[in-house]
Each structure stands twice: as C-alpha cells, then as structure tokens.
UniProtKB/Swiss-Prot annotation:
Species whose genome carries this gene: Burkholderia multivorans (strain ATCC 17616 / 249)
Family, similarity comment: Belongs to the inorganic carbon transporter (TC 9.A.2) DabA family.
GO cellular component, one term: plasma membrane
Protein's recorded name: Probable inorganic carbon transporter subunit DabA
Phosphoprotein in keyword set: no
Domain of life: Bacteria
One Pfam family hit: DabA
Quaternary organization: Forms a complex with DabB.
Ligand binding (Zn(2+)): C376, D378, H555, C570
C-alpha cells in the first residue's frame, strides 16, 4: 500500500492495518517495499550529525552542544531548537529585563545592537519594539512527536508522561549497556545497542503494566529484528514528507540528548582512530520504535486523530520554523546588546576606543627580563599573571595552550589507565609514562621495578575494598581491615582538613618513591624530540629570547566528592591536571641532546637557561614546583625568589576573588588560604571554585596589548607576535585550535546558563554517577545529564556567568586573518553565522569583522543616565 493511501486514511481518522506495508506483521517485508535505503540512511545520518559529543566525567571538557549546527546562523538554530525540542539558545527574557532595569544594558548598547544587526535594520525594529518585547514571555510552539500526542488517556495526570516513561526506559537500557565500572553484571557486548534493547524489552513488560498498556507484549512481537528494519518500519508508519525526516529524527534524538551526546562521543573517538561507530544510529532507532509501539498499543479513535494531527503539524513545519525565527529577532538584538555593554568596557580597558593605536612598547626591555613564566590561556590565569607582573616587573608572563604543545597520552606507573593529555579535538601521537630516578639519575630500572611492585600490591588491596563496598553483603569487618583508606577519605569529607592538594597520580606509591617518580616521553628519538621542542618554542614566541629561568605553569583544581572535578581542570589537557605536560616539557628542554638538536635548527638555548615545571591550583591559587631537586644552585636560587613572588601574588589573587566565594578579603593571609583549602577538601561543598564562569573574550596578541589592564578573570590570553609569523602559519594554528577550544568553553557556559533544564546537568546534590565515569543522572532516572550544574553557574542568589558570545580580538593584519577564514569553513561558519565576535587591533583603533569586511568599532559613549527611547 502506498504512503499516500496511508496518509489519506490518517486524515479520515483510520488506524493503519496489520497488513499495511511496514506494519506490525511483516516489518522486514515493509522495509523491502518501502523507501529506498539510501534516502533513509541520508535522513538518519543528518539527524545524527546534529548531535555534539559529550566527554566522560574523567575526561570532562567543555563542548558547545550546538557544535554540529554551526553551519547555520545562530538565530536559525535558536528557532530550530525551540520548535524541535523547546530548548532556549538566547538568554531568557527575564534575565535580559533584569540586566536592562539594572542598567547593566544601557540604551547605547541597545542602539548599537539595532545598528549592527542587518536583520534588525531590514525589519525596521525600534528600541521601543525591543523594550516592549521584554514584558511578553516568549512562547514558541514545539512540534509534537508521537509520544506527546498519544499521551491523552484519563489517567495521564496520575502517572509519568509517556515522554518521561520512555526516556527513563531508554536511559536505563543505555546505562546497563554502556556500564563498565559500577555493575557486577554487564551485558554481552557482542550485541548492538538496538539488539540489546530489543532483547531487554521483549522480556521485561514492566513499563506496560506501570503505564496501563496491557497490549504492549503483543505489539513487541512485531518489533523489527535489526536497526535498519526498524528505521524503515517507523518511517513507513509515520507517512511524513521526506523533506521533514531529518528534522523529525533530530527532534526524536533531542528527547534523549544526553545519551545521544554520549553516543556521539563514541563516534568522535572512533573517527579519530579511523574507525566507525553505530551506537547513535542504534539509539535513534530505539527511540523511533517506541513511538510506533505506543501507536499500536493505543489503536483507538483518539490515537488515530492524534496520529493525523502529528502528520499535519509536521507538514507545516517549515512555516512554523520561519515564524519562530522571525519572532526570535528581538532576542538576537538583546543578546547583542548584552554583549555590547561588556565589549565597550573591554575596549576601554584595552585603550582602543576611538584612539590611535600602535604597538605598545614592552613593559620591561628584553635585556632586563630575569624570568619568563608561561601560563595556560585559561581565564583563571589572568589575575595571577597580572599580580606577578605588578610585584616583579622583571617577570615576563606568557599565555600558551595548557597542553603546552605536547600531543601525548599518559600511562601512570604500574597501571594500564592510559589517558589523553591534549585537546579533545586531537588524537595523541606520543606516549608518556613514569620514570623513577633520584637527582643524580640513580635508581633507574631497579628502583622503577620496586616502585611498580609496591604500587600494584597496594592497588590489589584497594580493589578488594572497592569490590566489597559495592556488594549488598558488604561486611564492616572487611572495610575495617582493608578499606581504612576509604574511611579516611570519608572522614576528611565530613571534617575537611586544611591540607594542600593531593596528587592523585601518586596514589598507592610508598612515600619514598613519590619524590622521584617523574613522567617522561618514551619511544621518541633525539631528532624527533628536537623537532617537537623547536615547534613549541616557536609557538610560545620565545625561541629567540630565552630568560635565565623559564617556568612552565600548568593548572589543576582541588575539590572533594565532585563527580565533575575534571571539568575544573585543564580543558586543553582533556580534563586533566597540566602537571604531566609541563614536567615532560621542562625535562625535554633541559635535555642536552635536545638542546644540541635545537642548535642545529637555529635555536640557541643559553647554557644558564633552566626550565622549571610548576602547577597553579586554581581553587586555592597556590603554586607548586616540580623536580626542583634537579636544579643547580643558581637556578634553585632564582626559583626560590620567584616562589616568594608567587606567594605574594597568590595572596593578592585570593583577596581579589574572596568575595565571590563568600569569604572576607580582609582576612589574614594564612587564614584565607586555610579557608580556601578547607572548602576544597569539603565533600559537601558544591562550589569549590567558579571555574571559567564569566568567560567572555579571547585576546590573541603580545602581552603588551593587555599589560596592566584589569580583565577580571574573564579573558583567555594567548601570546602572539605577527611580525615573527611571516607565513601566517602560527596564526592559522591559533584560529583553528585554541580559538575553537575557547569557543567550546564559552558556549558550554552560555548554553547551560540560557537553558539549565535541557543544556545543564541540574542539581549537584542529586547527582548519581552512571557507569563509573560516563555521566550523571539527576536522581536515579531521566536522561543522562550533560553540561554544567546549577551550582557551577549560580550562587543561590544570582547568576555568576553572563551568557555572552566570545569576543575574539587578534593583533594581526586583516588580510592574514581573512586568509585563515577563507581556508577553514569551520572558522568561517563561527564568524559569519554569529557564534562568536571577531575583532582586530587596527592602526586607529579596534575593528570588528562583519559581512566579510572590517568596520570601526563605533560603539559610542556609555551614557551616565538612561534616556527613554
């Protein structure tokens, strides 16, 4: 029977019949007689490509949840998300209204937005239109799915909705299928996800009993055996125009967006390895099949009317999407006005609004620089860099990507726990493991073997304790005998100490080995080491001007009982501490053979130059040095002096941010540090630090462009000197790697703030970890939650993050920047479609890039008083 005939029946309110093509009795036959396979595959693949990946908890990095949608303008995506899934992309109007009424958004900001947005000018939108819109809630209709319109029985208010029930069932199935750590029984992984779900639901009809569907078991017998048959079966039954298939399928995936994002991550990792992965297609088939199962089970007049209504709504989807996009224009104007207020302040701090701009002189002449300190570009580094520079002007601070150019994976001593230490966009190509040696190189293989044996022995006991605490019959006597470490950790959570950060990579090592366990590159020859070192020094901009002491400062956070702890660590290191990277790089650059290779490549490292690895604890703003026992006396003296400077600078930064964490900045320095440590070690503390909340801008240029400016920990800072980059290759790297990482961070915070219900992970207090590391449930049901928790964004009284799109400011000729844009579609989409703002330093002031041209910033003055439009 043709699709047209099925649609005509639906319009008359008739249900599909058992012998219709694709209906229950013969799904395989329906697949053969239905739509061409390539058209089904194209629609399913398009829907799956719309889902951005979500990394597991132990490698948590920030991701723009709309990353796979950047090929369309941001307002179009805002309309699609609203209509397909009730997801908000722009800031809620109540937040904008509050910012307007408090003068956070000034009239000049609104005027600027109306002038800068061509669509607003074309529509003749006025300030009054925009202000009036703030009094009206934005209610955009969502296109219905089968599970929504079939939820119409008289008892629907006394039970879960079908959307909730199906999400729960699919979610629990995924949790069981993907579990690797928590469960003592695991499914066989020779089954596909679809096959596992089909087998599970065929034997467990509990959802039918709970939801009042006694016919579910009968309908399940018609469930197709394979994912491919299920896709065809559902699309035949739906009878929707092919043009709307991708949108309908995307809307279906968005009902289980958390698990879809996990499956997208598995696909991302497979592609990095040159392989393929089908989990996301399986998940789509599962979720699609549920709609048809429900339709079969509710085969009555009401169900037939509901089915016809779905078809009608989706035939009109293009008009609905266009209307939503038009209605969201005012919200796009307010988004830009919100950003303009911050941008004007930023431009003023950089001294570039309406003033002639030339490259400023360095704060300290090169010959007077005694120390170079390279920090991660992370916004939390900015206050510390500023403080260090103010205390000791002979220190030159540098911003560089936090993985320090090392494409490595790290395997701790005596473990198989290999982990990436580089951005999620990349795959590791080098390996790091631990060497064990004293200051004079003593120990070698013998000491390493002894340390490995001791660690494995301790791990064996720890694993027994871990297993005991997971089993229902756990005996306190066993925990008492073998799990004292666990009880100690629990006791510390309940009564937090004021101890400094513990290095987890040393867990299980006896104390005598901890000081001499050092990460090192393996499997790489001297020539490759020299090539790697040369690229990194050129990237940092110090290949021609090395100070006597060069400190490489990674960063890490400190928290207890925090499932999302990795999200506070270094995103460029894939949610890990930057310790491994800086220690390996310092060792590499101090190596005699590497320096000889650098000399052959035209880079002379002075004999008295020493590289030291350090770590910035972003929770307590403490600095820790590594491998300082290897320093010669002169370098050790320089390090001691710098460590004192770091101590004063850290105290300054702690006072600067004390108010944000509810502490008194006037507190005595030791007490303030102790209070921050206590918060960090408190297992009940849901806000150990604010992470990257507030991030809003990225400056790519020499430090002289921002030196002395108080940027409030809101700016990523990456050093770059275009005069030393004659072919533009370094600029291209910066715009296609660090800029994308910063954009991912910025949009994760943006999305989690604008729509915490859909794009955030909810309340930390209610989190339950899924699969040991996959993600979290809020409570014990519902979809896998992705994004940031409410406590990461809100202090209980107000939002600590403003959802502003990233403003990228580059110090480079316009032609050089445009060449990168033209060569990279991803970069072009981000800029042309409004996912970030692009500025550059010009000869007479800042310029903004819009409509493929550079325009003067022309943001106007910020009036002292509000004028009614």
């Amino acid at each position: 029977m043709s699709t047209a005939t099925l649609e005509q029946r639906a319009k008359r309110g008739e249900a599909p019949r058992a012998n219709d093509a694709g209906h229950c009795a013969h799904p395989a036959d329906g697949a053969r007689r239905g739509y061409p396979r390539e058209r089904i595959d194209a629609a399913c693949d398009a829907a799956c490509r719309s889902i951005a990946p979500a990394w597991p908890l132990d490698r948590a990095i920030a991701v723009n949840p709309h990353w796979e949608r950047i090929g369309r303008p941001v307002r179009e995506i805002a309309a699609r998300m609203a209509v397909l899934a009730d997801i908000k992309v722009f800031p809620p109007r109540e937040q904008i209204r509050s910012a307007w009424e408090s003068a956070r958004i000034a009239p000049a900001d609104l005027r600027y937005a109306l002038q800068a947005l061509p669509a607003a000018q074309a529509a003749g939108m006025t300030e009054r239109n925009c202000i009036d819109a703030l009094a009206r809630p934005l209610n955009l209709p969502r296109l219905p799915l089968l599970i929504d319109v079939l939820d119409d029985d008289p008892l629907r208010h006394e039970r879960l909705s079908w959307r909730q029930a199906i999400t729960h069932q699919v979610s629990q199935t995924c949790a069981a299928y993907f579990d690797e750590h928590q469960a003592d029984w695991r499914p066989h992984h020779d089954q596909s996800l679809y096959a596992f779900w089909r087998d599970t639901i065929s034997h467990d009809h509990g959802i039918g009993v709970l939801m009042g569907l006694p016919r579910l078991g009968q309908s399940l017998r018609a469930l197709p055996a394979t994912r491919q048959e299920a896709e065809a079966w559902v699309l035949e039954r739906l009878g929707l125009p092919e043009a709307v298939w991708p949108d309908y399928l995307e809307a279906v995936l968005l009902t289980v967006n958390g698990w879809a994002s996990w499956c997208a991550y598995l696909g991302w990792q497979a592609r990095l390895a040159g392989e393929s992965d089908e989990h996301l297609r399986d998940l789509l088939a599962i979720r699609l099949a549920w709609g048809v199962l429900l339709l079969d089970c509710k085969d009555d007049a009401a169900a037939r009317r509901a089915f016809a209504a779905v078809q009608g709504h989706w035939r009109d989807s293009a008009a609905l999407l266009a209307d939503a996009q038009a209605r969201l224009l005012v919200d796009e104007v307010w988004q830009l006005a919100f950003e303009a207020g911050y941008q004007r302040e930023l431009a003023g701090k950089l001294g570039a609004v309406g003033q002639p701009q030339t490259i400023p002189e360095a704060a300290t002449p090169a010959e007077e620089i005694e120390v170079q300190a390279a920090f991660c570009i992370d916004v939390r580094s900015e206050p510390l860099r500023r403080a260090v520079e103010s205390i000791w002007p002979a220190v030159q601070t540098i911003g560089f990507a936090g993985f320090f150019g090392l494409p490595v994976a790290y395997t701790p001593l005596a473990t198989s726990a290999r982990r990436p230490q580089l951005p999620g966009l990349l795959a590791p190509s080098l390996e790091v493991t631990d060497a064990v040696s004293g200051p004079a190189g003593e120990g070698g293989g013998t000491m390493r073997a002894a340390a490995s044996t001791a660690r494995r022995t301790r791990f064996a006991l720890s694993n027994q304790a871990s297993a005991a605490t997971r089993l229902p019959g756990t005996s306190f006597s066993f925990v008492e005998a073998a799990g004292l470490g666990y009880l100690g950790k629990l006791r510390q959570w309940l009564k937090p100490s004021r101890n400094p950060r513990v290095r987890d990579d040393l867990a299980g090592l006896p104390p005598r080995y901890k000081a001499v366990c050092r990460p090192a590159l393996v499997g790489i020859d001297d020539q490759a080491k020299a090539d790697l070192a040369a690229r990194i020094l050129h990237g940092m901009g110090i290949a021609r001007s090395l100070a006597p002491l060069v400190v490489l400062v990674g960063h890490a956070s400190q928290s207890a009982n925090n499932a999302h702890a990795a999200a506070l660590d270094c995103g460029a290191c894939c949610g890990q501490s930057g310790e491994v990277n800086v220690r390996v790089l310092a060792q590499l650059l101090n190596d005699r053979a590497t320096r000889a290779g650098l000399a052959q490549r035209g880079i002379d490292v002075p004999d008295d130059t020493t590289f030291v690895a350090a770590l910035h604890n972003t929770t307590t703003d403490e600095i820790e040095g590594f491998d300082v026992d290897l320093l010669n006396p002169i370098a050790a003296a320089r390090w001691a002096k710098l460590l004192s400077v770091f101590g004063h600078a850290s105290d300054q930064v702690r006072r600067e941010r004390a108010v944000r964490v509810g502490l008194d900045p006037r507190m005595e320095g030791g007490r303030l540090l102790a209070s921050l440590r206590e918060r960090a070690n408190d297992g009940a503390q849901t806000r150990p630090e604010w992470g990257l909340a507030g991030n809003a801008a990225f400056v790519i240029g020499p430090r002289t462009r921002s030196h002395g400016a108080v940027l409030d920990g809101r700016c990523f800072l990456h050093d770059y000197d275009f005069t030393q980059d004659t072919d533009g290759s370094l600029l291209e790297l910066l715009m296609t790697a660090p800029m994308l990482v910063a954009h991912w961070i910025n949009w994760q915070y943006h999305a989690s703030t604008c729509d915490p219900a859909h794009m955030g992970c909810g309340n930390k207090v209610l989190h339950n970890v899924v699969g040991g590391h996959i993600g979290v449930f809020e409570g014990n049901s519902g979809d896998l939650r992705i994004g940031l928790s409410k406590q990461s964004l809100h202090d209980g009284q107000r939002w600590m993050h403003e959802p502003l799109r990233l403003t990228v400011i580059i110090d480079a000729p316009g032609a050089s920047i445009e060449r990168v844009i033209d060569r990279h579609p991803t970069v072009r989409h981000l800029i042309d479609h409004g996912w970030l703002h692009l500025w550059r330093f010009g000869e007479t002031g800042l310029l903004r890039f819009s409509d493929r041209q550079w325009h003067p910033l022309a943001m106007g003055a910020d009036p002292a008083t509000r004028q009614s439009p």
